[in-house]
Amino acid sequence: MLSRRGVMAGAAALAAGAAGLGLGGCTREVKAVAGFIGRMTAIQQRLGGRLGVYALTGNGDHTASGSLSIQSTERFAHCSTFKWLLATRVLQMADQGQVRLDKAIAYGKADLLDYAPVTKANAVRGHMTLSELCAAAVTLSDNTAANLLLAQVGGPAGLTQFARGLGDSETRFDRAEPDLNSNQANDPRDTTTPAAMAWLLKTVYTGTVLKPDSLAQLKAWMVGCQTGLKEIRAGVPAGWTVADKTGRGNGAVNDVAVVWPKDKTGKEQAPVFLAIYTTGGTLGDDDRNQIIADTTRLVFDSIGFVETLGQSASVSAE
């Protein structure tokens, strides 16, 4: 559960870190954090279930990062949020010469799942390229595309190994679509933590996992994601760049993103890596989407990310 003690300890740490760096406005930031707990508690009460959040900033230097966390080490079903990482692995394999993105992957009617808008539309062709499948999996969350890609990366076990190689000891992949969306209580299969997913985003976007052109392609796919227009994207000001991947299934509604804020002059700032996972409760889809949008707004409004985080400060409501 959310803890006032945890948030206030985070506020003190935030103020101390800002003071140590000679930053002004510490009192303002502490007051902002002090109000955070009530607003977040209200959001979780509206949800009627469990909410996990991890937000991280910084340009790859672990000593120059700020974070906000709410139940960020608890496990949640990742559902389709994993598809951005699946596309990352395919791009890495292409960078390493193991595959070509224009390689045609054959499939038939037996491979088509209920939710497969792009692969169904291309079924007459009988194949799609790896690049086309990645685009389908990320931008429209096509489940058949994801399964065809999983087969190319060594299945769930191969994708788990990839995550381990990126330093993630938490995220695991056990099944293919649609079974991975079962979201059963106390079932560790096909789960992640908000902290693990946010760090994966940061590792990929600020590291050397992908060559520059491949990273640009991943960003383009995620910026083009059409399934999350009412979630994280709805919680940030118009004009900010958002690259995200959503996921939902059996009471879980999730969104993970890289967000590039803009200052008052319109200049793009350092990215924020954000993972929001929810499960449980009885809200409908529209209300669940609003929970994620409101949580996103709270992340950026209450803490003052652009000015403060990224200065080795952290705020935790664990």
Q: What name fits each language-model region?
A:
Residues G52-L56, L85, A106, L148, ...:
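Soluble periplasmic/extracytoplasmic beta-strand elements of cell-envelope proteins
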